UniProtKB/Swiss-Prot annotation:
Catalyzes the base-exchange of a guanine (G) residue with the queuine precursor 7-aminomethyl-7-deazaguanine (PreQ1) at position 34 (anticodon wobble position) in tRNAs with GU(N) anticodons (tRNA-Asp, -Asn, -His and -Tyr). Catalysis occurs through a double-displacement mechanism. The nucleophile active site attacks the C1' of nucleotide 34 to detach the guanine base from the RNA, forming a covalent enzyme-RNA intermediate. The proton acceptor active site deprotonates the incoming PreQ1, allowing a nucleophilic attack on the C1' of the ribose to form the product. The keyword Zinc applies. Binds 1 zinc ion per subunit. Pfam families: TGT (PF01702). Keywords: Glycosyltransferase, Metal-binding, Queuosine biosynthesis, Transferase, tRNA processing, Zinc. It catalyses: 7-aminomethyl-7-carbaguanine + guanosine(34) in tRNA = 7-aminomethyl-7-carbaguanosine(34) in tRNA + guanine. The active site is at D89, D270. Its EC number is 2.4.2.29. Homodimer. Within each dimer, one monomer is responsible for RNA recognition and catalysis, while the other monomer binds to the replacement base PreQ1. Its cofactor is Zn(2+). GO terms for cellular component: cytosol. This is Queuine tRNA-ribosyltransferase. Substrate binds at D89, S90, G91, G92, F93, D143, Q192, G220.
Length: 373
């Protein structure tokens, strides 16, 4: 991986990340392709939208169709025909959240499949083996995620395990690269610690001392804590993260969350929000959210957003989308998802331009002014 900082403004960073499959300009939002596809869209749609990197989910792909099958097709790129970069998470979050009785121990996580109830065990090495099969460009390590709020003792245990597993993972990755496995794949560690400054500092320092990691993520946020608490935690944590490596905030979030955390030095984001909200009738626009289900749009000839240049806005009216949603037409999911993802990707493009022009404050102010009208 190549990484360079192209410019900064008010704490916000514009960077370039080069992987084996694409050049990624930051700040970057990564659409979530849980099953190897962004819901309702295919590889061509994502290319038309200009996506340079999307997320794949190790837990789901491990269970179905299985990483060995995907490997036969040349990894995720060959299987999905999306030629640009993939980031795959470790699957730890899904093992934690989807299994009724997941049990972490010192060596990994035992969980039951949400599909058929079969028992499985993730370890720092096994999740990397799965990601080697997937041939993703950026692999996330297994981390010990805890629900918030929680006891100090449990959060301390989470940090200790995550650090231990990170060391196991990076050692294993270096060994595998010596064998010619995963030579072009990059590996990120995940900082934990809840919303405690003391714990976040401890986790960040322990992980960031492991210099062989290609980047670092902030995990365990956007799980119900107030927004201001999330922003404070990110601002506190980034100061302990290296400036010369990518910074990734996992599972975040709303357009406002992205703007606030870009200002706090974050480079990379992912969230299911644009596609999930699209399917539920909520569309993102330059002036805020629009609920296409409302009767007021039944005969509205305007596009979703007059300032938007996406395929949906260039071709279809609010009235048509209102009709498709009410009729439960599958086409609605595609057109709405195209719009919402375009909105997110374009917001990141505008943010980058503002950073490079060193007028972040003006950009951020205008972002909020338009949404308050």
């Amino acid at each position: 991986m190549e990484f360079k900082i192209d410019g900064t403004s008010q704490g916000a960073r514009a960077c370039t990340i080069k992987t084996a499959h694409s050049t990624i300009l930051t700040p970057v939002f990564m659409p979530v392709g849980t099953q190897g596809t962004v819901k309702a869209l295919d590889a061509n749609d994502m290319l038309e939208l200009g996506a340079k990197i999307i997320l794949g989910n190790t837990y789901h792909l491990y269970l179905r169709p299985g990483s060995k099958l995907i490997k036969k097709f040349g990894g995720l790129h060959g299987f999905s025909k999306f030629p640009n970069s993939f980031l795959t998470d470790s699957g730890g979050f899904q093992a934690f959240s989807l299994s009724n009785n997941s049990k972490p121990d010192e060596n990994g996580i035992t969980f039951k499949s949400h599909i058929d109830g079969s028992r499985h065990y993730f370890t720092p090495k096994s999740v990397l083996d799965t990601q080697y099969d997937l041939n993703s460009d950026i692999m996330m390590i297994l981390d010990d995620l805890v629900a918030l709020p929680n006891t100090d003792e449990r959060i301390k245990t989470s940090i200790q395990r995550t650090t231990k597993w990170a060391q196991e993972a990076i050692n294993y990755h270096m060994e595998q690269k010596q064998k010619g496995i995963g030579t072009h794949q990059n590996i990120f560690a995940i900082i934990q610690g809840g919303t405690s400054k003391e714990f976040r500092k401890l986790s960040a320092q322990q992980l960031c001392d492991m210099s062989d990691f290609d980047g670092f993520a902030i995990g365990g946020l956007s799980v119900g804590e107030p927004n201001e608490q999330m922003y404070e935690t990110v601002e506190w944590t980034t100061q302990f993260m290296p400036k010369d490596k990518p910074r990734y905030l996992m599972g975040v979030g709303t357009p406002e969350d992205l703007i606030e955390n870009i200002e706090r030095g974050v480079d990379m984001f992912d969230c299911v929000m644009p596609t999930r909200n699209a399917r539920n009738g909520t569309l993102f626009t330059s002036f805020g959210k629009l609920n296409i289900k409302k009767a007021e749009f039944k005969d509205d000839a305007n596009p979703i957003d007059n300032e938007c240049s996406c395929y949906t806005c260039k071709n279809f009216s609010r009235a048509y989308l209102n009709h498709l949603f009410r009729a439960a037409e599958i086409t609605y999911f595609r057109l709405a998802s195209i719009h919402n993802i375009h909105y997110y990707l374009n917001l990141m493009k505008q943010a980058r331009e503002a950073i490079l022009a060193d007028n972040w404050s003006e950009f951020k102010k205008e972002f909020y002014v338009k949404r308050s009208k």
